[in-house]
Amino acid sequence: MKHVRLASACLFTLAACASSTGGPTVTSTTQNETFISGASQYDVSSKEQKDVMEQTILAPIDSAWRALPGVFLELDVEPGTVDQKTHVISNTSFVVRHTLGGAPLSRYVNCGSSISGPAANQMKVTLSLVVQVVASDSNGVSKLRSQVDGWGVDEAVSSSRVHCASTGGLEARIARMLNDEISHRTKKAVP
């Protein structure tokens, strides 16, 4: 079968479904490809959706931004990109095996399951983590937007990579850790 990529169109859509209660914003990517086999042509369109979780941080944007690198360090995730202008810290390609931040990886991503349990706990998983602090309409409060996505490979057998979707657990943990870090810093600053 001959594979011809005629068009690779990416369509990014941010749906307006993020709420003040921390609902997800959906980012969609659509890719169109054509496969040719003999005299037959197959047009395939695939769509991938990624949730962007938004959660409230009980501090102004500057305080939250200053505390965010400490959260990455505590999780043992090396920041790949730090953009002070847009308040984004990310690492879009880091490898994790079995656990992340002392917790089973399956708490944060779902890569399917095997006969011995959640596949994420048995695979080499490459994760993408993008976190942004944004201002909120409320005084003294900011918002944390985070997105987790990944791919896993079972190194014990020859296998294709599988998509590992976020469970929302890592996004929630990062928000809790950030609020805790800010609270700790505030208590230290008060005599």
Q: Which residues make up each language-model segment?
A:
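Bacterial N-terminal signal peptides that target proteins for export
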Residues: M1-A7
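Ser/Thr-rich, low-complexity intrinsically disordered terminal regions
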Residues: A18-P191
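C-terminal motif of bacterial Sec signal peptides marking the signal peptidase cleavage site
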Residues: L14-A16
